[in-house]
Structures are given as C-alpha cells and as structure tokens.
C-alpha cells in the first residue's frame, strides 16, 4: 500500500500501480506522437501505398492460382481426331471474314472484288491523273496456305516476291503493294503513250522503252528565240512504285556541257522531267513556242 501511495502522492490511485503506469506511458506516447507527427504521417502514407501495391499483387496471384486450379481440376481431354480440322476450319472462316472486310473497305478505291466458290477474285484498277487505265485480276483461293489460282498481272511485275512477303501474313498489305506496282507501271506507260501520240512532231526519233516502262530514252526538239535546238533525254525510274523518274539525263549533241546557256537549258529540262508527267513537260514546251510566235506576230 505504501508503494501505491508513493506513486500517487496526495490522491488515491485508481486501478493500482499498473494502471497508473499505463496512463503515464499513454501520456508519453501522445507527447512523442505530437513531436513526430509529420514524419509519422509521411511514413504512414508510404506504408499505405505499399499496402495497396501488395494487395494488388495478392489479388493478381489469387486470380492466377484460381485459374490454374481450374485447369488442373479439368479432366484430361481425350484425343479428338477432328480437333485439328475444327481449328483449321476456324482459321479459314476468319480468313473469309477478313476478305469480306477487305472488299467492303476497298469499295470506293482502285481495288474491288467478288466472292467465288473457292475464295475471292480481286480486280485491281489503275489510273493516272483522273484517267482510268488498265485493270488486272487476281483469283485467290481461301485455304491454308492462301494461294493465287489465276491472275492477269504482267510477268515483269514481281507478283511472286510480293506474295511471298505479304500474302500469308497480311492480305490487305499484299493487295495494296501489288496495286502500287501496277498503278505506277500503268502511269509510266500512259505518259509514254501520250508522248508518242500527241507530241510525235516534237520527237526527232523513236521513243525507246522497256516492258516495265521504267527506262525511257528519246530525242526531241524545242524552238527558242527563232531557233530549233535538239536534245537527248534518258529517264530512269529506280522506284518501281513511282510514276515520275528518279534519275534524268539531258544532253545536246555537239554542244559543250560547260556552256552557260546550254547548262541553263539542261538544268531546266531535267527539273521539269523530274517533277512533271512526261506529256505535260512537252505541253509546256509547246506553250512557250506559241507564246514566242505570238510575240513575234504582235
């Protein structure tokens, strides 16, 4: 009793010595918490974040364990000889759906097609500057692997190379890439045909071209300042999907290349051939000649 009174001088201790000690400890803890409150809050926030992360990981692991357990509980599947056939059938059905989507997407473009009993027959239409040109078809058989049954693509178009790169993995990419080749070829051929038919009086020799129309050479004449000048041109189309040349060489027989007037004409003609369709270049030459004649008359 004396011990208790010593710990509680002047008043009675409620609950005994242990209770009094607990109260003192609680008061001390409160005081400490007040002094450490900012650090504690920061630590608590960090712990809450960590707890959330751990709970997310726990939930994820629980889901994986549950999924794995369901698989383990499943009875072993019996060998089904038709399983492979069904799987292949599903793949083919998916290919059919892809083809339908392609036909719908290309309804208003240069590509169109119709479904056949074996697959789809695609029609690839070409055009240049609003002029409809030749059309080609590719008959595809929808099976694994996809294959080309018939086609009307010219032999100099690398159809097999394009098919090997894209047909089995991306049919749309295959068709678009093939269209690029065919459309560029048709555009180059159209320009050469226009030059021969509409500007034959300007050509001083035959237009030479290869089957792909990616190499053209010709000689032509241009009237300037009451004089007629002859030029030779060589146009190379290194990009098979381009309708304009990548390399142009213009020469003039018997004239020094270093001559300033000649160099100016050469550079001007080369720039025109690189940036404009062939027949439009010669149309501009004709307009310049007409202007010159009008100026002389007036």
UniProtKB/Swiss-Prot annotation:
Region (Disordered): 29-49
Function recorded in the entry: Component of the CENPA-CAD (nucleosome distal) complex, a complex recruited to centromeres which is involved in assembly of kinetochore proteins, mitotic progression and chromosome segregation. May be involved in incorporation of newly synthesized CENPA into centromeres via its interaction with the CENPA-NAC complex. Modulates the kinetochore-bound levels of NDC80 complex.
Protein family (similarity comment): Belongs to the CENP-O/MCM21 family.
Transmembrane segments: none
Organism: Mus musculus (Mouse)
Subunit (UniProt): Component of the CENPA-CAD complex, composed of CENPI, CENPK, CENPL, CENPO, CENPP, CENPQ, CENPR and CENPS. The CENPA-CAD complex interacts with the CENPA-NAC complex, at least composed of CENPA, CENPC, CENPH, CENPM, CENPN, CENPT and CENPU.
Domain of life: Eukaryota
Residues where Phosphoserine is found: 35
Name of the protein described by the UniProt record: Centromere protein O
Keyword Coiled coil included in the entry's annotation: yes
